[in-house]
UniProtKB/Swiss-Prot annotation:
Residues 221-242 have a biased composition (Acidic residues). This is Homeobox protein Hox-C8. The lineage of its organism: Eukaryota, Metazoa, Chordata, Craniata, Vertebrata. It comes from Mus musculus (Mouse). Residues 206-220 have a biased composition (Basic and acidic residues). Interacts with HOMEZ. Forms a DNA-binding heterodimer with transcription factor PBX1. The gene is Hoxc8.
Amino acid sequence: MSSYFVNPLFSKYKGGESLEPAYYDCRFPQSVGRSHALVYGPGGSAPGFQHASHHVQDFFHHGTSGISNSGYQQNPCSLSCHGDASKFYGYEALPRQSLYGAQQEASVVQYPDCKSSANTNSSEGQGHLNQNSSPSLMFPWMRPHAPGRRSGRQTYSRYQTLELEKEFLFNPYLTRKRRIEVSHALGLTERQVKIWFQNRRMKWKKENNKDKLPGARDEEKVEEEGNEEEEKEEEEKEENKD
C-alpha cells in the first residue's frame, strides 16, 4: 500500500517537500501536534512513521535561540521553522507579515488624502458646532436683566415668614423706620417687606370679611406717609443719576 501511494508521488516532490500543500496559515505546524508524523529521511529513503517528540524539542530549542525580537514583532501570527530544514519537511518558511499597527500606518501613508480629508472634516464639524452654539441674534428679552422681563417671584424662607408673621401680629402696619430694621434683620429689601405686609393684610381681610383692620386709620396714614417719603427719595436718586 505504501509503495502504491507514496512511490508515484515521490518522483513528483523533491526531498524536503511534503505530501500536503505548504500554504498553511496557522501558528504551529499541524504534524507537530500529532503523536506520529510521516517524514522522509535525509537521503531520500522510504518514508516511515517516527515519533515527533524529539522533533518538537528540537523545534522549540532552535526556535527560542534563533528568533529575534524584530522577527517576533514583524511576524506575530505565523511561526516559521528555524533550524535544520530536513527535520521539518513540507513546512516552508511563510512570508513574514507586519503588525496591525504597521499595516495601519502603511495604509495611512499609502492614502494620505484620506487622513487629510478626515482632519478637514473634523475641523469643519467643530467650526459648525461653534457657530450653532453661539446665538447670532440677541433680543432684549433674552437678556437676564432686560427691562421688559418680569422678575421671578420672591420666595421666603421659613424663618423669614415666621418673623414677618410675628411682626404682623404685633403691628399690621410698619413705619418706614421699622421696615428698614426688619429688612436688615431678615436679609430682605424694604420693597419685599412692604409687599409681604400688603399681601398679608389682603389675606386677613378676605379671611375676616372686613374692609379694614380694627384701629388701622392712624396706622394707614403713617404708612402712607412713609411710602410717600420713600417715593420722593427714589425720585431724587433718579434725578441725581441723570
